[in-house]
UniProtKB/Swiss-Prot annotation:
Keywords: Cell inner membrane, Cell membrane, Chaperone, Membrane, Protein transport, Transmembrane, Transmembrane helix, Transport. Required for the insertion and/or proper folding and/or complex formation of integral membrane proteins into the membrane. Involved in integration of membrane proteins that insert both dependently and independently of the Sec translocase complex, as well as at least some lipoproteins. Aids folding of multispanning membrane proteins. CDD domains: 5TM_YidC_Alb3, EcYidC-like_peri. GO terms for biological process: protein insertion into membrane; protein transport. The chain crosses the membrane at residues 3-23, 359-379, 429-449, 463-483, 503-523. The lineage of its organism: Bacteria, Pseudomonadati, Pseudomonadota, Betaproteobacteria, Nitrosomonadales. This is Membrane protein insertase YidC.
């Protein structure tokens, strides 16, 4: 196989892997139309139907499905903890705005990252809960609170925000948000006191409303923004907004969670253990969707009280924390079909970071470690290329000898390879084996929130973003040129031009890659150059020694 075919084979194989990886991953949904200017201008039909727990509940009239979606607003309750700045509306006790104090905005890092907001610019994203049946409060009813400002005091480990609703029939409902220090898991409780003369048989629902907008950027490939749920039976499932638009989800389960996933962050409702639940999705208007869970609570007799607890995880996709919150929540960190490779890579990378306390240095050390693991394969590849380099003059003479008779030329080349014990594919296959590791590391550096705004040194202050001055891509291009010089020079002028242009093309590609990935590739190239130079020198010495012995 000649140099041209080798180049085409490598490029084609790499392209197929990248395209397959891209196809396997859910694509980012198209931007929704900007017809609405504020969340309040949209119509509302967001109350789910009641769950059916018994024959009596089956006869109970569910809340009728309304058309459209309207998000109304009343008094706001402001909450501040070590991790959050939150805003709760007294209508429904909805969580209307949520800022993450430990994570900063992409455009202005003096501002907190806004995970949830009830405005449609840049996006509508709220968490709602409610009770259905017997006139109990849905997320449209007005609650009261003793205060409009709550703050987690120094030395305190938790903060309770209590909202109260009292019905005309005597039923009293308390909705309590419990924020805990150093935790992104918010406890949301209902205390239902039936002070009426008749039994009530309600259902409880938890849902997230989103308008299919996303301000999360990505590099070269889109990242997923959409719904997700997990059960022990079905495991982790994702639901794109286009899927929600086509059909409503209705999935019964006895465990699991439901939520919304976006680049680096996730919000998930985790109902109380043992509570039978139905996961659902609903298209509320042209671009507004809800995804949630509804559960029957059973009969609550007069004079009886019931307490129900659930959790809302709303925060970064920090893998160590996700595993401890709920089973399957760690799957929201999506590394695609190469998760089996990416997961241990991230574990090694994070273990190194805990020692060196710098993600950039950790990437460099991981690169060295990967290079050591693949050293035998790389050495075989470079040794094959070095041998091909030594044969280049003889190959040129064969081409001149046989001219356009490609069949005889091919036979002569194969005979020469056999005599010299050289595999022309020897320089290609070891490289192909390493490509899945490269792709897996790409998704680790792109999809891990730990990389977001992680500084390295000097001008690299965000390893998840592109190099602002393109220094790393340019340096990487220079190393590729050096590698090209170390490889066998193609006899065909067209092939030589291709080899000259490739470093420029790859450098342009890497202009749009995260700086952390370019750093990995740059360090890998530098190590490869050192290894290839050493092997070339060794091969040249061996060839010279062989010629000297032949003269004797």
């Amino acid at each position: 196989m000649d140099t041209k075919r080798l180049i085409l084979f490598v490029i084609f194989s790499f392209s197929i892997l990248m395209l397959w990886d891209s196809w396997q991953r859910d694509q980012q949904p198209p931007a929704a139309s900007q017809t609405q200017t504020t969340a309040q201008s949209v119509e509302d039909g967001s109350v789910p139907q009641a769950a059916k727990s018994s024959a009596s509940a089956a006869n109970q009239a569910s809340v009728p499905a309304e058309t459209g979606f309207r998000l109304q607003s009343a008094e706001r309750i402001n909450v501040e903890t070590d991790l959050y700045k939150a805003s709760i509306d007294t209508i429904g006790g909805d969580l209307r705005r949520l800022e993450l104090r430990e994570h900063k905005d992409d455009e202005d890092q003096t501002k907190n990252f806004v995970l949830m907001d009830d405005q449609s610019a840049p996006m509508l994203y709220v968490a709602q809960t409610g009770l259905i049946g017997n006139g109990l409060p849905t997320h449209k009813e007005v609650f009261t609170s003793e205060s409009t400002n709550y703050q987690l005091a120094p030395g305190e480990d938790k903060l309770d925000v209590r909202l109260t609703w009292k019905g005309d029939n005597g039923v009293e409902v308390h909705k309590i948000y419990t924020f805990r220090r150093d935790s992104y898991a918010i406890e949301v409780s209902y205390e239902i006191r039936n002070n009426s003369d008749t039994a009530v048989d309600p259902s409880v629902y938890y849902q997230i409303v989103h308008d299919n907008q996303s301000h999360q950027g990505s590099y070269m490939m889109p990242t997923f923004t959409g719904g997700a749920y997990y059960t022990e039976a079905d495991k982790y499932k994702k639901l794109s907004f286009s899927d929600m638009a086509k059909t409503n989800l209705s999935k019964n389960a006895s465990d699991g969670w439901v939520g919304l996933v976006q680049h680096y962050f996730v919000s998930a409702w985790i109902p109380e253990d043992g509570l039978v639940r139905e996961f659902y999705t609903k298209k509320l208007s042209d671009n507004v969707y809800s995804i949630g869970s509804v559960s029957p609570l059973g009969n609550i007799a007069p004079g009886q009280s019931v307490t129900l607890k659930s959790r809302l995880y709303a925060g970064p996709q920090t893998q160590s924390e996700l595993k401890s919150v709920a089973p399957g929540l760690e799957y929201t960190v999506d590394y695609g079909w190469l998760t089996v490779i990416a997961t241990p890579l991230f574990w090694i990378l994070s273990s190194i970071q805990k020692v060196v306390h710098n993600w950039g240095v950790a990437i460099i050390l991981l690169t060295i470690l990967i290079k050591l693991v693949f050293y035998p394969l790389s050495a075989a590849s470079y040794r094959s290329m070095a041998n091909m380099r030594e044969l280049a003059p003889r190959l040129q003479r064969l081409k001149e000898q046989y001219g356009d008779d490609r069949q005889k030329l091919h036979q002569a080349m194969m005979e020469m390879y056999k005599t010299e014990k050289i595999n022309p594919m020897g320089g290609c296959l070891p490289i192909l084996v390493q490509i899945p590791v490269f792709i897996a590391l790409y998704w680790v550096l792109l999809g891990s929130v730990e990389m977001r705004h992680a500084p390295f040194m000097l001008w690299i202050q965000d390893l998840s973003a592109v190099d602002p001055y393109y220094v790393l891509p340019i340096l990487m291009g220079i190393t590729m040129i050096i590698q090209t010089k170390l490889n066998p020079k193609p006899a065909d002028p067209i092939q030589a031009k291709v080899m000259t242009i490739m470093p420029i093309v790859f450098s342009v590609f890497f202009f749009f890659f995260p700086a952390g990935l370019v750093l990995y590739w740059l360090v890998n190239n530098i190590l490869s150059i050192a290894q290839q130079w050493y092997i070339n020198r060794s091969t040249e010495r061996a060839a010279a020694k062989k010629k000297g012995n032949a003269r004797r």
